[in-house]
Amino acid sequence: MTPPEGAKTELAKRVVVALDVRQNDHGDLVVTKGDQYDVREKCEVKGRGGVRNLGKPVALASRYYQEGADEIAFLNITSFRQGVLEDAPMLQVLEEASRSCFVPLTVGGGIRSYTDDESGKTYGALEVAATYFRAGADKVSIGSDAVYAAEDYQKSQGHLSSETSIEQISQVYGVQAVVISIDPKRVYVTSPDEAAAAGHVVVSCDDNVGPNGETFCWYQCTVKGGREERPICAVTVAKACQALGAGEIMLNCINADGQGTGFDLTLMKAVSDAVTIPVIASSGAGKAEHFSQVFTKTNVQAALAAGMFHREEVTIQEVKDHMKDENIPTRI
């Protein structure tokens, strides 16, 4: 239907579903979900619990497409341990999903240059991305490699080398094909001055006060699935990656991950205000209202959830119905 002449039109806000994919202890690919990035069940006795198994990747992706997801993101959360080109099961998942899911598919994990330990052959990030695109991906999500690229960009005072994975992939496939996944965590400070002097963007965090009553924090980026901290903040990484050629930011928050208490609105606002490319809010969604909150209080263009959909606590349709009731443009 054509809108009335002079009526304001807005882009629909997107509801994205994420599927964190990894091998379980039996070697099968399963969809799992972390609690602050820990994907293993809590174990009362000494030792590790098993990997949470929330279903098969292709079956879940097909279900979410039928239920109205605007996009689906496959995140290969252990890909830093091996090369993507040797990960035939993950590529097969992507190929099968692309035959039944006719919405944009994003795949992340291992988008980097690497050398195969057995053959000694080196593969470039562009070649890795091309393999994912041939398997059916519409976008690739770059994580750790993007943080390293942002650090180099900052050190070089804004020099474009044309050698980063972001630049190489966006130059061939377009900026819309490159998503940056940022995994930050809060670092609380008593005063903003010291962190700001180090180049970090410090924000007021009254909604998430620190353990000692701190009301300021900055968001420190991590790599390797949250296992290693880097001396750079999320806002700086987002701005650098936009300059390098990224077309979208998938913004996570380790503190909020798996908590179901809502997105970190302070983080989402800080980053979405700092860049002009779309930002996808991620981590913390537990009910439909959380989507409406992040869309009305920040400038994000999309919001992502995983666990609440996997466990069928909330449906995609319930989220979109709530958004419609709040006059937030969405695809029904």
Q: Can you describe what each PLM-predicted range is?
A:
Residues E86-Q171, D325-E326:
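Glycine/small-residue-rich loop that forms an oxyanion/phosphate-binding "nest" at active or ligand-binding sites
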Residues C101-K139, Y188-S191, T266-A303:
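Catalytic cores of alpha/beta
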Residues T2-C101, Q157-S161, Q168, V172-I180, ...:
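Conserved N-terminal beta1-alpha1 strand-loop-helix module at the mouth
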Residues A18-L19, L75, T106-G110, G143, ...:
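A cross-family glycoside hydrolase active-site/sugar-binding cleft signature
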Residues V21-Q23, T78-S79, I111-S113, A146-Y148, ...:
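Active-site-proximal loop/turn and secondary-structure-junction residues that shape catalytic pockets
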Residues E71-I72, Y132, V140, D145, ...:
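Hydrophobic residues within beta-strands of alpha/beta enzymes
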Residues D25-G27, G258-G260, A288-S292, R311-V314:
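Short active-site-adjacent structural elements
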Residues A61, L94, A129, I166, ...:
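Generic hydrophobic/aromatic pocket-lining and core-packing "Φ" positions
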